[in-house]
Amino acid sequence: MAANVPPSAETLLSGAAAHPPKTAEEIANQYDLLPKLIPFLDRHLVFPLLEFSSGQDDDKEIVRAKYELLKHTNMTDYVANLWQEINNSDTIPDEFVKKREEVLAKLQHYQEESAKITELLQDEDVVGNLRSDKVANLKFLEEQHGVTPEMVNSLFDYGRFQYSCGSYGNAAELLYQFRVLSTDNDKVASATWGKLASEILTTSWEAAMEEVQKAKESIETRLFNNPLGQLQNRSWLIHWSLFPFFNYDPARDVLTDLFFSPAYINTIQTHCPWILRYLAAAVITNRGRAHKSSSLYQKQLKDLIRVVRQEGYEYSDPITDFVKALYIDFDFEEAQKKLGEAEDVLRSDFFLVSAADAFVEAARHLISESYCKIHQRIDIKDLSTRLGLNQDEGEKWIVNLIRDTRVDAKIDYKEGTVIMNHPPQSVYQQVIEKTKGAFFRTQVLSAAVAK
């Protein structure tokens, strides 16, 4: 019988003390994705992530990590400064002085080697005679201006060198010029990735999105018979796309659609399931965007719920757990708890920190909408608690929700409740809704069999 005796208050309190709630810093560290992201990023793209970590982690460790990251680049002055900081020294070792001289000499060499062709490509008369046919362009430049294939390749080499020096704007321009003329598909693909990285690092988001599209097309065509190569390249593109994803509003819809497309959602599920964090954040924050159509948003939400359910065994964090709690388990208390943890994770994530407030706002709307759908009479205090608000804030929130969504509800201030008017759905309407889903699934199966 003793085994069935409920635990005493003292036992419960001692247990709570032994497992106190995690701090925001502990939650952030537990769900830090940096080690998973680094293998899919160019070293120059990793640098902003380390810079962001400077205010959160041990500064000495971050400085050392920056040094290890960049020591093989041609950013010699910056690397030398990092070495001085690590070693607490005012002098610069001879190896850095020597490397700096070598870098300057190479820059001079590349500049001279590509001088003729860069001048030609800045001449409006010459550019005006160029067409979409690269072979014809090369023939025209060779016959009229003595341009050789080696001169074209010098643009590629010079662009790569400028990128290694951290001159991303110059690199983007040189790689663009090379791509206009070159017929070397492998080098053109490499130039596209280099230009994408350069546009990201100069925060030229519109140009970056153009390069995302070009990289996507290159993956589909150049690697058509190489499934493993496509998987690897799609994984890179997914990770590189995170930079414009939350920094450039027009990119949000384009990239959300891309990530949900069959080839890319399959890549995420098989190769990098942690990207679900960013997809979930994008879908949830899409709720508050004025131009977003309700039907498209509902479709994205359904797709997200499906993927979170499928991948729960493989990857989870407070953001995906929030989706699971609210839409799979229908556990409002757990959803509230996970929302609090999700906010800590969002504010410590380089890509999501700017979306944290929008996520919390949208998530509260989703909690309240789901809660209101299944309750006829709602206690304002109870709903406020579930939203992580005090009663006054909760009351204002609910008033705004009713006004903004035009839901049929009345607030009884005396009783402190909200009375929801849920019109009964006719049997005919229920049959129609169920038939719609069955008809769609039949179409999908028929299409699959036809293939």
Swiss-Prot record:
Residues 256-425 form the PCI domain. The keyword Phosphoprotein does not apply. Keywords: Cytoplasm, Initiation factor, Protein biosynthesis. Its main location: cytoplasm. SUPFAM superfamilies: Winged helix' DNA-binding domain. One of its GO terms (cellular component) is eukaryotic 43S preinitiation complex. PROSITE patterns: PCI. Component of the eukaryotic translation initiation factor 3 (eIF-3) complex, which is involved in protein synthesis of a specialized repertoire of mRNAs and, together with other initiation factors, stimulates binding of mRNA and methionyl-tRNAi to the 40S ribosome. The eIF-3 complex specifically targets and initiates translation of a subset of mRNAs involved in cell proliferation. Belongs to the eIF-3 subunit E family. This is Eukaryotic translation initiation factor 3 subunit E.
